[in-house]
A protein has these predicted regions:
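Terminal accessory/targeting
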Residues: 1-76, 88, 92-102, 213, ...
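Active-site beta->alpha N-cap acidic-glycine motif
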Residues: 46-158, 259
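Catalytic domains of cell-wall/extracellular-matrix polysaccharide-remodeling enzymes
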Residues: 111-112, 135-250, 254-271
Length: 275
């Protein structure tokens, strides 16, 4: 597939760990954090509109982001594969610690755990699309890729928030057809800098250590609240937040990072990745 070798070399420099996705579905990764928006306010606030414009600006020069620029000491926690049975506890922990996060939603999970998305919205967290059924997109025809993205996006919008502008490909797998679908839906692909590999359940301490050791200015950290037993990730979350702040990092959402400290225009532009 066109550009696979060049892309893999480029992504090795920006995506650590090579993982990224629940083990069940994929083969594949401040002194004070910014406080999330007031409950229920994000979708209509001036801040939301500024962040949406920032996403549009970034889309003007790249279809993906795997980190912000290194200028600011900011990191973004991203949480995938939910909502799930522990999502409410993730939300409560983040709110208690005034820690922003970006949740990437699997559409079919809303059948059983829609209350989790409602809590994320009320807390003012950023919301992205993670496909309808956590499909490996490179195994789908182009039209089915677009449908997998759109079906989840429409479900998310039905909860009273705007159509999502951010998308994370399950397992990090994408190809030229994925990028074409994202252009159609005006979405930015969000990869990651630090893969905690929490889906392998290595223990809360190991998850925390990977998140903190891998953090650099502009890092996007990959965690999961769904797709399996996420008790270890939940247990690690407070220590991750405290230790990142002790190292002088400010926690932000992905849209906030794109507004404050967007990636360089010289970052590699992916053509395809995966099978």
């Amino acid at each position: 597939m066109l550009g696979v070798l060049a892309l893999v070399i480029a992504l090795v420099a920006i995506v650590s760990g090579g993982g990224g996705g629940s083990g069940e579905k994929t083969s594949t990764r401040a002194r004070s954090g910014a406080t999330p928006a007031r409950p229920g306010a994000r979708s209509t606030s001036a801040a939301y509109r500024r962040e949406s414009r920032a996403i549009t600006r970034v889309l003007g020069y790249t279809p993906f982001v795997a980190r912000g620029s290194p200028r600011k000491r900011e990191v973004a926690l991203t949480i995938d594969d939910g909502p799930g049975p522990l999502t409410s506890r993730f939300v409560r922990t983040l709110r208690h610690l005034h820690a922003p996060a970006t949740f990437f939603i699997v559409g079919q999970q809303l059948n059983s755990f829609g209350a989790g998305l409602r809590e994320e919205i009320r807390a003012g967290f950023a919301i992205g699309d993670h496909t309808e059924q956590h499909q490996t997109l490179t195994q789908l025809r182009p039209g089915l890729q677009s449908k997998a993205i759109q079906d989840a996006a429409l479900r998310i919008r039905s909860y009273g928030i705007p159509y999502p502008r951010l998308f994370r490909p399950p397992g990090g797998f994408f190809n030229a057809a994925t990028m074409a679908a994202l252009r159609e839906h005006r979405m930015l692909a969000v990869l990651w800098t630090v893969d905690t590999q929490d889906f392998t359940r290595p223990g809360a301490r190991a998850i925390m250590q990977r998140a903190v050791d891998g953090a650099r200015n502009g890092a996007i950290i990959l965690l999961h609240d769904g797709g399996g037993d996420r008790t270890q990730t939940l247990a690690a979350l407070p220590a991750i937040i405290h230790r990142l702040r002790a190292r002088g990092f400010q926690l932000v959402t992905v849209p906030q990072m794109l507004l404050h400290d967007p990636p360089s225009k010289r970052q590699a532009r992916p053509i395809s990745h995966g099978a």
